């Protein structure tokens, strides 16, 4: 069971704004409904020069050997805009990304990411600019992301970030919707008991 306490990984800088879900994973690869196997289609039209994935685009940053095992994506505002396809999140996770840092995200993409345990971090534009300058200067740089302390540590500098306390608690404990439902199962049963009791009394009264 994966509990997100902290993560240290190589950062890949993708200096593009308004990356939509069709760029993250094109629509022709959405035929499966399980979450496995979508990583090979991530940023397909940018990573490859042909539809059969035979010609790798040498200029796209994810194809650089330095970022082969990158697990943190640094990008710009409005990441994940466009259609609400959850496959976009699945492809990022399946590729190996654990954290995405940007100045803003699409609301639906943010929700889908939280539900799939992909940590999204929102920072001010000046912090994003600083981090881009840093990773472009020191190629292959790693960040440490502490969800407990809500901070990114790089080069002995701590950059704090905000996250909803409930979401942080769920990620730290690896709770999903089923887990949360089970935690209030006794309340649900009590509610059902009271409701059905009321309905039975009403039926008896009207019969």
UniProtKB/Swiss-Prot annotation:
Listed Pfam families: Aconitase_C
GO cellular component: 3-isopropylmalate dehydratase complex
EC number(s) on file: 4.2.1.33
GO biological process: L-leucine biosynthetic process
Keyword Amino-acid biosynthesis in annotation: yes
Keyword Ribosomal protein: no
Substrates-to-products reaction catalysed: (2R,3S)-3-isopropylmalate = (2S)-2-isopropylmalate
Role of this protein: Catalyzes the isomerization between 2-isopropylmalate and 3-isopropylmalate, via the formation of 2-isopropylmaleate.
Name recorded for this polypeptide: 3-isopropylmalate dehydratase small subunit
Biological source species: Buchnera aphidicola subsp. Schizaphis graminum (strain Sg)
Gene: leuD
């Amino acid at each position: 069971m994966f509990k997100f306490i902290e993560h240290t990984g190589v950062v890949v800088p993708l200096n593009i704004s308004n990356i939509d879900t069709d760029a993250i994973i094109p629509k022709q690869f959405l035929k499966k409904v399980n979450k496995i196997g979508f990583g090979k289609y991530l940023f397909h039209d940018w990573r490859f020069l042909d539809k059969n994935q035979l010609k790798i685009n040498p200029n796209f940053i994810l194809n650089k050997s330095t970022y082969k095992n990158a697990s943190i994506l640094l990008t710009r505002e409005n990441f994940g805009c466009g259609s609400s396809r959850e496959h976009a999140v699945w492809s990022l996770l399946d590729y190996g990304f654990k954290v995405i840092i940007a100045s803003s995200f699409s609301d639906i993409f943010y929700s889908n990411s939280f539900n799939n345990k992909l940590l999204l971090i929102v920072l001010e534009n000046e912090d994003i600019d600083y981090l881009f300058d840093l990773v472009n200067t020191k190629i292959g740089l790693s960040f440490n992301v502490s969800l407990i302390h809500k901070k990114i540590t790089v080069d002995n500098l701590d950059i704090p970030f905000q996250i909803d306390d409930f979401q942080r608690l769920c990620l730290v404990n690896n709770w999903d919707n089923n887990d949360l439902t089970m935690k209030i199962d006794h309340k649900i049963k009590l509610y059902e008991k009271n409701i059905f009791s009321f309905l039975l009394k009403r039926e008896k009264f009207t019969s």
